[in-house]
A protein has these predicted regions:
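Active-site-proximal alpha-helix that buttresses catalytic centers in soluble enzyme cores
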Residues: 1-69, 93-105, 148-163
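Beta-strand elements within well-structured catalytic alpha/beta cores of enzymes
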Residues: 3-8, 40, 123-133, 137
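Short, solvent-exposed loop/turn segments at secondary-structure junctions
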Residues: 10-13, 45-46, 135-138, 165, ...
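Acidic, low-complexity terminal tails and accessory targeting/binding regions
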Residues: 31-32, 60, 67-87, 125, ...
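Glycine-rich phosphate-binding loop signature in dinucleotide/nucleotide-binding domains
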Residues: 33-34, 119-127
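Conserved glycosyltransferase catalytic-site signature
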Residues: 44, 48, 109, 113, ...
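Internal catalytic-core helix/loop-beta-alpha segment
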Residues: 87-123
């Protein structure tokens, strides 16, 4: 069995950096996670920092683990919608209803799934990899794998497995600090 843990970064502040609570939660989770032979993050400081705290190692930043650049271009507007309605950034992006943003989110979901499939194909039997990404990419990507495309909590995500019987996806729930 080969496994890719696809996790969302830790809790972030208004500037997009990890909060103290987010850092503590990632450090706490480190003790329950398996060893990883590959550690990948987006190029965002919060995903790099999260991956480092989860593993004690520096990740390899990969732009395929990012979130849609079209969403980044209107992130202040989307963040304002999220704050006003008390909803996730992903749900706010959907509510923003900008066709370019929605297309970008969809395209990024396919790119992230391609990265997951590539990494799964490169792992040896019994090996695991970690990819730390963003809710805005993870949820839609897992929607294409038959899971709910709903927003996920910080440090939550999915475990995508590949074995003799094919592939499977299971939800991964973050532990509380």
């Amino acid at each position: 069995m080969r496994e890719v843990y696809l996790l969302r970064h830790g809790e972030k502040d208004a500037e997009g950096l990890l909060t103290e609570r987010g850092k503590q939660a990632a450090e706490t989770m480190r003790s329950v996670l398996p060893a990883f032979v590959r550690i990948i993050s987006s190029e965002s400081p919060r995903t790099i920092h999260t991956a480092s705290l989860l593993t004690g190692e520096e990740p390899h930043p990969d732009p395929r683990a990012a979130y849609a650049t079209t969403a980044a271009s209107v992130s202040e507007e989307i963040s304002a919608i999220a704050a006003e309605h008390g909803i996730s950034f992903l749900d706010a992006a959907r509510r923003h209803n900008n066709p370019d943003v929605l297309t970008g989110i969809d395209e990024q979901a396919h790119i992230l799934n391609g990265l997951v499939d590539e990494v799964l194909g490169e792992l040896g039997e019994g090996e695991r990899a970690l990819i730390v990404s963003h809710d805005l990419s993870i949820a839609p990507a897992m929607g294409y794998r038959g899971m709910s495309a709903e927003s996920i909590e910080p440090l939550g995500g999915y475990v995508i497995s590949l074995g003799d019987e094919g592939s499977s996806v299971q939800r991964f729930v973050a532990i509380a600090p």
